[in-house]
């Protein structure tokens, strides 16, 4: 394998990160490839300097505080159209109830939310409105402008605000590359270009979780539901619009 630059993949859920992790398993030797950093307790006391590829569901601000060589790494991520992203994330957690082995390995707080989501008809405006009006706890942290949260790391109990949005856009502008899920293949090729990887690489694999059954279909044809969900995507939308209108590479 060719020597590649040290990288950190900021793995925002439901943005094709499983595919990217699988790709880099082929590019980086096993002993220098580490995924799912969120599963490691006491990260502050660990040394990751020997790892070429780091990936995890860890907000960027937190990663920069606990990984000592973060300034030496190329950092990239993928973002997604916010309504589609929100619905995919809600659906993924809800669908855990249909797969007992996967359901059982998740923390109780996730199981509790999955069971709650399973009782909601997300095509029913009144039920969705009731859910949004009462959202708190883990559901707030999981669904409130989750992509902005992955940059700025606000408290789980705190709603995001316009200051978080501005900070997230500023942080995103400073990392090596921000890819777009809706332009996935081109974004992956651009990541490889930023890393100076010129190998003959196949991108034929299917996206992980691509069969995730959605709780709402054709959201953009349902203006009333979009209006109800808007508080959960308003700042993510500003972040997304910023990067679909600009050159996505900051290299």
Residue positions per predicted region:
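Non-transmembrane alpha-helical segments in soluble domains
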Residues: 21-25, 83, 87, 188-192, ...
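PAPS-dependent sulfotransferase catalytic core
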Residues: 53-64, 166, 200-250
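PAPS-dependent sulfotransferase catalytic domain
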Residues: 40-52, 56-77, 84-200
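A cross-family signal for N-terminal binding/gating loops and helix N-caps
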Residues: 2-66, 78
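Short hydrophobic "helix-edge" motifs at membrane interfaces and signal-peptide entry regions
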Residues: 5-7, 70-72, 226
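A residue-level signal for conserved active-site and pocket-lining positions in enzyme catalytic cores
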Residues: 16, 81, 179, 191, ...
């Amino acid at each position: 394998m060719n020597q590649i630059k040290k990288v950190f993949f900021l793995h925002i859920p439901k943005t094709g990160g499983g595919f990217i992790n699988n790709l880099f398993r082929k590019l980086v030797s096993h002993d220098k490839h580490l995924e799912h950093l969120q599963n490691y307790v006491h990260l502050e006391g660990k040394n990751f300097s020997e790892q070429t590829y780091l990936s995890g569901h860890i907000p960027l601000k937190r990663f920069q505080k606990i990984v000592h060589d973060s300034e030496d790494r190329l950092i990239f991520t993928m973002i997604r159209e916010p309504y589609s992203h929100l619905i995919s994330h809600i659906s993924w957690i809800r669908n855990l109830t249909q797969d007992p082995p996967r359901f059982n390995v998740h923390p109780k707080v996730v199981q509790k939310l999955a069971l709650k989501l399973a009782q909601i008809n997300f095509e029913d405006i009144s039920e969705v409105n009731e859910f949004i009006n009462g959202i708190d706890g883990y559901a707030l942290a999981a669904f409130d402008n989750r992509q902005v949260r992955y940059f700025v790391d606000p408290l789980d109990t705190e709603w995001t605000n316009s200051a978080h949005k501005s900070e997230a856009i500023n942080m995103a502008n400073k990392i090596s590359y921000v890819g777009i899920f809706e332009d996935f293949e081109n974004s992956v090729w651009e990541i490889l270009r930023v890393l100076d990887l010129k190998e003959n690489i196949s991108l034929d694999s299917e996206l992980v979780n691509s069969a995730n059954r959605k709780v709402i279909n054709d959201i953009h044809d349902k203006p009333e539901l979009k209006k109800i969900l808007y508080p959960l995507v308003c700042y993510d939308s500003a972040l997304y619009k910023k990067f679909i209108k600009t050159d996505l590479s900051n290299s």
